[in-house]
Amino acid sequence: MPIFRFTALAMTLGLLSAPYNAMAATSNPAFDPKNLMQSEIYHFAQNNPLADFSSDKNSILTLSDKRSIMGNQSLLWKWKGGSSFTLHKKLIVPTDKEASKAWGRSSTPVFSFWLYNEKPIDGYLTIDFGEKLISTSEAQAGFKVKLDFTGWRAVGVSLNNDLENREMTLNATNTSSDGTQDSIGRSLGAKVDSIRFKAPSNVSQGEIYIDRIMFSVDDARYQWSDYQVKTRLSEPEIQFHNVKPQLPVTPENLAAIDLIRQRLINEFVGGEKETNLALEENISKLKSDFDALNIHTLANGGTQGRHLITDKQIIIYQPENLNSQDKQLFDNYVILGNYTTLMFNISRAYVLEKDPTQKAQLKQMYLLMTKHLLDQGFVKGSALVTTHHWGYSSRWWYISTLLMSDALKEANLQTQVYDSLLWYSREFKSSFDMKVSADSSDLDYFNTLSRQHLALLLLEPDDQKRINLVNTFSHYITGALTQVPPGGKDGLRPDGTAWRHEGNYPGYSFPAFKNASQLIYLLRDTPFSVGESGWNNLKKAMVSAWIYSNPEVGLPLAGRHPFNSPSLKSVAQGYYWLAMSAKSSPDKTLASIYLAISDKTQNESTAIFGETITPASLPQGFYAFNGGAFGIHRWQDKMVTLKAYNTNVWSSEIYNKDNRYGRYQSHGVAQIVSNGSQLSQGYQQEGWDWNRMQGATTIHLPLKDLDSPKPHTLMQRGERGFSGTSSLEGQYGMMAFDLIYPANLERFDPNFTAKKSVLAADNHLIFIGSNINSSDKNKNVETTLFQHAITPTLNTLWINGQKIENMPYQTTLQQGDWLIDSNGNGYLITQAEKVNVSRQHQVSAENKNRQPTEGNFSSAWIDHSTRPKDASYEYMVFLDATPEKMGEMAQKFRENNGLYQVLRKDKDVHIILDKLSNVTGYAFYQPASIEDKWIKKVNKPAIVMTHRQKDTLIVSAVTPDLNMTRQKAATPVTINVTINGKWQSADKNSEVKYQVSGDNTELTFTSYFGIPQEIKLSPLP
């Protein structure tokens, strides 16, 4: 390794007293395989910051405290055309496969840095990588950066996928995610020890500030092209669609636009408090928060202040692995979401402020924050490496811009801000284009930027263009809410579910409902009103949410945030907005739900809605939602969430720092909650045994084995499309769950299987399971009856008439025994060899950070032992249990089981006759011919239900298989059900076809998106 010359640099800086030792600079390589996840950073605030740099005679490197990104100094490079400086750093460029293995997600090694121009330069900065580079030697690979900009810009490229070939003969193809292809970067291998920065040759001289040069592992999806640098990844810019015919410029249309604008301003200044806004109204606090940013204007242009970064731009640093000095400087960054929230709070205060002096100060604060934001590189054409999940960071910038539009115009900043916001909105191009497509129903768009989109359009100064844009926006919102997106795309579904991340996801849909409702409300009663089809579809989704919430959604529907279930109370205002936007307002259904979840009375309704409306009663009966492979059974104030999963619906969402132990979230779960807080009912994370989800059949694993085998995302799907629920008469329901584990997933027993069925009717549910198998000889298989925290108000169990409050407590139950949990739910054991009941102290772990937790819990579970072979179980749950009632039910069971009868229970078919309701539920896990009073044959896997009432037979059927792929839309499935006897339809409105064939009747059900169909039959005379 040669000794690099630093003579010219040392003379310039007076910093170096000895020749540079090249070995010192390269002894700790970047991307060291022993510590691949620790980013290597040059930030010029460190000791001897230029030790690894050299320059030719036409370049001068100095340190400047004028502006910086990381720390208080940057590198100022004064150059003459074609001159260069070199960073001497050994790289061991990993393949994407090696990087991905180290991080546990699709990754790539990235080279990134920041640069600042005080004036645009008509030329390119050339970055070269090679071995023993000097100013005149040929490099092996590199890339170019266009310099025609002012302010800060960030450059970030994949060393495997974004470099251009120089003089080497290489197989210069992109590296696949598994690293099987060579790339320029990989062909360099461990040969790189020099990175050369070469000034444009076509410009006589200039100067550039450079800071925060970094080598790090980053997500392979997020090195985006922009106006400065070309990478393999591009985010196309927005092209506004214009609907035809366009509305003319008339006083009426302009007045409507102004009305919408004022409504929007009024909502954000004085309307409903935003759930995701840290509202601050204290002027002194706003000023102190502003002062903490340390923003000041520089004499010759630009600003200096704390560096701004989005919460997702943090990732490229791998902050958990930074050394202590780098971490300290990194921690001084300001998160853009907090910054733009302050901008909004200042803009809101500005609108409300009456004192001229105070108002002027707020205005100057806002304008300086805007200038700093732009100077930091948040401008049109600047990708800043990536700005994914932009809406969460920037949503309040858009709204503040509308509130401060006059001040921005006066300062000649509005056009630049408008262009910047439009540029960064391109992540939601499928929405901002306003042309309905498969990707146009993005719930995250509604959640974060839909109202901001409208605010941006209202800034358009040209009257005709502004009318066109708002009119197109209205048509787009109508279409986005109306369409059924194909495959797993975001949007509303025919059964009332609302999809995000390829599944029903209240954590995303609830705020999206609220914001979509507000948009419809803002546009109401104008030529720009949202169409009725969009309104109707949103109403269906929001009424469905009312059904599957109590008011929180159950743990099985909480996504990656268990014990933080979204509540309808957080989106109550959305029901008001949508009710008041009805064609004939208010819509009575939505208005009554609003009153109920807002705890408003009938007496208050007149002042709210202008007429007397009774608050909605809690839903009752059974509702199938196969868009989420779940069913909801409501009885009085209790809600039972029955949850399965299949090839179309994932079991749980597990992230790197979320829901690490959530594997069993959908394993035939049957969570019971009363109306109110789930925490108050014992659903507490501290001490929670993650193996024991209520109703689930699981292998009881130590936490280290239960922890997801994937370091990052796991959204496990089933091996079959069949698993889900059905309903009958809106009152009765059934779940069928076919549990089959994958064959090749670490820490998942490939031989773990179970068939689980539940029949729900009124105040009781019947649970049966069969074909329970496991090959794990060390871990017990269990079916959990319940698990609740013990608290002062949840401190009692009843077992066979005995009140239990002891702690600790252990006992074993068997067939015929009963117990009542601390929430008043009764459990009658009707077929099980061993049921364990426990009141004990439990030690567990937090789902996000794996830190220990502990708590006291009551639990009961059926113990299937280790390696069960075709094990089975049966039990009943009563939702209105008392010791007296459970004693009566146990007596009925002992008397020849007067409660229910299992007519069949094997790997192909489960049949349950509920004697209390006279409803029969059939889970056809396979097509089958059966011996039964009513059903003779079913030609496809299906859930069939029957109810005999006097002279009529009501039959429903469905397949929970949505018959779709992740890309292709769901299509209907025809189910043929042959029933015994000759019948005719007693329901003219039924869509079920029927035909008598010999002594039987053939029923043809069309199952679309798992929505059950039913028919009422009467005997042929």
Curated annotation (Swiss-Prot):
Site (Transition state stabilizer): R560
Activation/inhibition comment: Is inhibited by Zn(2+), Ni(2+), Fe(2+) and Cu(2+).
GO cellular component: extracellular region; periplasmic space
One GO biological process term: carbohydrate metabolic process
Active-site residues from the entry: H501, Y508
Binding site for Na(+): H43, M70, Q73, D211
The UniProt record lists the keyword Metal-binding: yes
CDD domains attached to this UniProt entry: GAG_Lyase
Keyword Ribonucleoprotein: no
Induction details: By chondroitin sulfate or its degraded products.
Temperature dependence comment: Optimum temperature is 37 degrees Celsius.
Function as written in the Swiss-Prot or TrEMBL entry: Endolytic, broad-specificity glycosaminoglycan lyase, which degrades the polysaccharides chondroitin, chondroitin-4-sulfate, chondroitin-6-sulfate, dermatan sulfate and to a lesser extent hyaluronan, by beta-elimination of 1,4-hexosaminidic bond to unsaturated tetrasaccharides and disaccharides. Is not active against keratan sulfate, heparan sulfate, and heparin. Is able to promote functional recovery in the injured central nervous system (CNS), via its role in the disruption of the normal organization of the extracellular matrix (ECM).
Family: Belongs to the polysaccharide lyase 8 family.
Subunit annotation: Monomer.
Protein name (Swiss-Prot/TrEMBL): Chondroitin sulfate ABC endolyase
Organism: Proteus vulgaris
